[in-house]
């Protein structure tokens, strides 16, 4: 009966203050800390009042973190059911699970001895000129690195005149002058953090990003020396190192909030954070706190994510706030390859997977290309092609890597049977193909262009030998300077234009903890984000002020370089590159701006056909600007009735048309003009095409920097985008014990005793939903209650091993009788139940059932 009185007290109190909102987990890939919650209080509710409320509510809880700027706390309760009731506690505004963010995934390559050409990323962005001509270094700017810590002893972080870096809180002679370890080495996201204050990095990621922001390895004489000199974007910034990850594993979102608050209180001008997860929605505590900090004058950049192989709608949530910067990755100009030299030309190659070791053939062996009567290269699929050229002993046979008739395994076997000592495969399309090959035969794949050069050289002198390099060298690769394949596609769940901007993130050489080798190359949007952070620092120093984060984002976006993919004649979608590749030099020199810095046209139902922009002349003199529309690639994001966005959206030459109220506009110095744009949707009839482009204002003055803003939209009614993966039979019921799934597709009819056998629900979502519900109906289809399934994020198409990523939920037979858990859960009596999955359509009001995609599962019998 004690319970009843608790309920009464909650209900009485709840009538005074409206109940809070319990948020579902919207990260398709993240885990949660069991029974841990982040709660936000209503404005004006003090921590003491809130704790009184929690206590009267009889929730037994422990405080994990108390926050100050974010009005709330994180707590642990005894059971999941206690947590779900939190939303009804007076004074509570929002309740979230504590999500565990993965340590950002990067591709790591060991840095090889290279030459100075490889410091190419600053040429792409104007940062080299800012360093050399304008002497900008980010001096005086404070940058918070919320990450795995920083190896502060690294010589690349040494203060001027010192040979070694150091960390001292508020220390004048250390570049790492702020920071804290919130977690300890053994923390993995799920266990209890053991803060120790020392932000030394044992994982490596934070040291790498810190080096990109402002490491200086130009003149290092101590060991280990960098494989080549390099410098970060802003080599005199002061760092705060806020360590939120242990040596491995993830980090709880409540730790991240604490780190963000401390970074702000330490006076950081900019924080840079990149956290995994493909939420695509901004209603999470991190994004909310980020917005608050930005409104107080701090800037924040977050990684767009490395989910480029998962189709559209996959941007990570850290950069999704209205004022935060979501950063896409561009490939560096150069990549490192072993190479052959033939006729004096260096040709990068990639070795076959089956051979998988360096090729150490003598440098005296000639080539024998397999040619047809016209001199064209044959595919090497027919053994007769080999017998036609005579003995291949001590020779390198050359064939075309066309996969129509055979793969590299078949081609390699033929070469081996014919007695060849090695094989060179000429790629038949862009890039250097990867080869499966055969064990025992050295097989190397080269680009098509190099293959053609090789044949031309061979035609002149058949005796030329191939030599094989021992080292790697830098080569301009096919996608050099263009958006990285791995970089995630937007838009966000609300169809806003994200990512915002791009920066070099593919193949970036930077610092690494000394204990782990000191330097390495890494790739990821994690590498692009700190580049933007460093760019902020240079911009702030150039303007001798602390402009609002919004102003800097706008300046960087307005002046970025709009880019094309490799060999493409058209511009890459703004849903992939944002406003383009950052050009900090142009941002500093520009004498114009366009507000807002992105145009969200939304879908056909909510289409913004008329949009006003403000073009400002920030220079001293009158300037005439010409406005034009520069279309970018359209993306076909769905095919047929498939629930899943396409892994690789198909590029379509389709775009909106734009007319301007004025195509030419003369603006006096310091003044602005309002220009009205009229948009028309593209004519295409493909399914939910995502189209985009750029509105560009070009000044008449020769050499003056043009400014632009990206626009993005989706044609069609976004409410009709399918959400649940019914194509592949999900959601489906499975058989579980209390902790694990035992049979993922048990025979019909399902009977569960809730002692040994529990029903489990396996689901998979191909699109985000603003709200998901799981209802339980009895045998007469009457609503019994709701299951707090708590998951509404989109899953990636597959994990790293190619397996589908699934949501699995083991049901203990309990339901909440109201949707927002204002009463304790009940266990359903024995009987037959139908479980209904309901996902709210994007951009709908959320009326049930009209605005939901609904899937009724086969009945479940509870014995
Ligand atoms: C809680 O649920 C009740 C009944 O389902 C509903 O009337 C009320 O509006 C909900 N409150 C909130 C804050 O969602
Ligand atoms: C900076 O952002 C990158 C990418 O998001 C992230 O991996 C890294 O942890 C962040 N480091 C800083 C500077 O906070
Ligand atoms: C989707 O399926 C419906 C019904 O089967 C069919 O009428 C429609 O043409 C399909 N749409 C596409 C784009 O394939
Ligand atoms: C549930 O099944 C898993 C896998 O078969 C097993 O490891 C675990 O011990 C079982 N748990 C219980 C509570 O029986």
Regions found by a protein language model. Give the residues of each.
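Subtilisin-like serine protease catalytic core
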Residues: 131-252, 266-269, 295, 317-324, ...
């Amino acid at each position: 009966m004690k319970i009843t009185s608790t309920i009464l007290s909650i209900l009485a109190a709840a009538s005074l203050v409206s109940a809070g909102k319990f948020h579902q987990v919207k990260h398709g890939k993240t885990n949660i800390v069991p029974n841990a919650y982040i709660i936000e209080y209503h404005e004006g509710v003090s921590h003491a009042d809130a704790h009184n409320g929690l206590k009267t509510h009889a929730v037994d809880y422990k405080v994990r973190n108390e926050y100050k700027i974010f009005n709330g706390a994180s707590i642990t309760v005894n059971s999941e059911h206690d947590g779900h009731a939190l939303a009804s506690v007076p004074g509570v505004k929002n309740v979230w699970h504590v999500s565990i963010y993965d340590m950002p995934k990067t591709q790591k390559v060991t840095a090889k001895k290279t030459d100075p050409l490889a410091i190419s990323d600053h040429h792409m962005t104007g940062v080299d000129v800012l360093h050399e001509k304008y002497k900008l270094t980010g001096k005086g700017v404070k940058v918070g690195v919320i990450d795995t810590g920083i190896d502060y002893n690294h010589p690349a972080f040494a203060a001027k005149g010192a040979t070694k870096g150091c960390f001292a809180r508020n220390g004048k002679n250390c570049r790492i002058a702020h920071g804290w370890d919130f977690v300890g080495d053994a923390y993995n996201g799920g266990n209890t953090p053991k803060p120790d204050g020392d932000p030394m990095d044992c994982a490596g990621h934070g040291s790498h990003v810190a080096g990109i922001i402002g490491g200086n390895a130009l003149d290092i004489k101590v060991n280990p020396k960098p494989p080549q000199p390099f410098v970060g974007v802003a080599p005199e910034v002061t760092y705060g190192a806020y360590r939120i990850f242990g040596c491995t594993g993830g980090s709880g979102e409540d730790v991240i909030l604490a780190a963000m608050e401390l970074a702000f209180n330490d006076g950081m001008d900019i924080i840079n954070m990149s956290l995994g997860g493909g939420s695509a929605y901004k209603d999470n505590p991190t994004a909310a706190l980020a917005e608050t900090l930005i409104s107080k004058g701090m800037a924040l950049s977050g990684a767009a994510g490395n989910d480029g192989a998962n189709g559209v709608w996959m941007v990570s949530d850290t950069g999704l706030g209205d004022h935060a910067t979501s950063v896409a990755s561009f490939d560096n100009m150069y990549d490192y390859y072993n190479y052959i030299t033939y006729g004096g030309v260096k040709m990068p190659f990639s070795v076959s997977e089956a051979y998988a070791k360096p090729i150490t053939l003598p440098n005296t062996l000639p080539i024998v290309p397999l040619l047809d009567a016209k001199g064209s290269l044959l595919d090497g699929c027919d053994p007769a092609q080999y017998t036609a050229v005579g003995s291949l002993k001590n020779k390198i046979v050359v064939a075309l890597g066309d996969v129509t008739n055979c793969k590299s395994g078949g081609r390699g076997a033929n070469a081996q049977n014919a007695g060849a000592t090695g094989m060179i495969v000429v790629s038949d399309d862009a890039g250097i193909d990867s080869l499966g090959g055969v064990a025992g035969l050295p097989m190397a794949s080269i680009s098509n262009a190099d293959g053609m050069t090789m044949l031309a050289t061979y035609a002149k002198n058949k005796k030329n030998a191939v030599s094989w390099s021992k080292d790697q060298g830098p080569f301009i690769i096919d996608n050099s300077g263009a958006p990285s394949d791995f970089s995630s596609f937007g838009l966000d769940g609300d169809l806003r234009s994200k990512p915002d901007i791009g920066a070099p993130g593919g193949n970036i050489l930077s610092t690494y903890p000394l204990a782990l080798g000191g330097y390495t190359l890494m790739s990821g949007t994690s590498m692009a984000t700190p580049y933007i952070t460093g760019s902020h620092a240079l911009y702030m120093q150039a303007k001798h002020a602390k402009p609002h984060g919004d102003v800097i984002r706008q300046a960087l976006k307005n002046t970025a370089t709009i880019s094309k993919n490799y060999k493409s004649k058209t511009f890459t979608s703004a849903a992939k590159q944002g406003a383009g590749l950052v050009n900090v030099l142009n941002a500093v020199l520009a004498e114009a701006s366009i507000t807002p810095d992105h145009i969200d046209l939304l879908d056909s139902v909510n289409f913004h056909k008329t949009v006003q922009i403000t073009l400002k002349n920030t220079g001293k003199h009158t300037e005439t600007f010409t406005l034009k529309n520069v279309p970018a690639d359209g993306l076909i994001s769905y095919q047929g009735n498939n629930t899943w966005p396409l892994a690789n959206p198909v590029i379509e030459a389709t775009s909106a048309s734009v007319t301007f109220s004025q195509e030419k506009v003369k603006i006096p110095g310091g003044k602005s003009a309002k220009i009205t744009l009229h948009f028309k949707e593209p004519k295409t009839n493909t399914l939910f095409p995502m189209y985009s482009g750029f509105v560009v204002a070009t000044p008449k003055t020769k050499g003056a920097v043009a400014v632009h803003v990206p626009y993005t939209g989706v044609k069609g009614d976004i409410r009709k985008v399918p959400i649940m993966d019914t194509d592949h039979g999900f959601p489906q019921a499975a058989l579980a014990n209390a902790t694990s799934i035992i049979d993922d597709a048990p025979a019909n009819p399902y009977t569960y005793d809730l002692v040994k056998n529990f029903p489990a629900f396996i689901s998979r979502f191909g699109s985000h939903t603003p709200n998901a519900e799981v209802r339980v109906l009895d045998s007469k289809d009457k609503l019994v209650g709701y299951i707090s399934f708590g998951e509404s994020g989109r899953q990636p198409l597959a994990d790293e091993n190619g397996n589908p990523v699934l949501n699995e939920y083991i049901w203990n037979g309990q339901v909440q009788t109201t949707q927002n858990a204002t009463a304790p859960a009940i266990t359903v009596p024995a009987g037959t139940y139908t479980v209904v999955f309901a996902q709210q359509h994007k951009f709908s009001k959320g009326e049930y059932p009209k605005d939901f995609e609904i899937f009724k599962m086969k009945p479940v019998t509870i014995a």
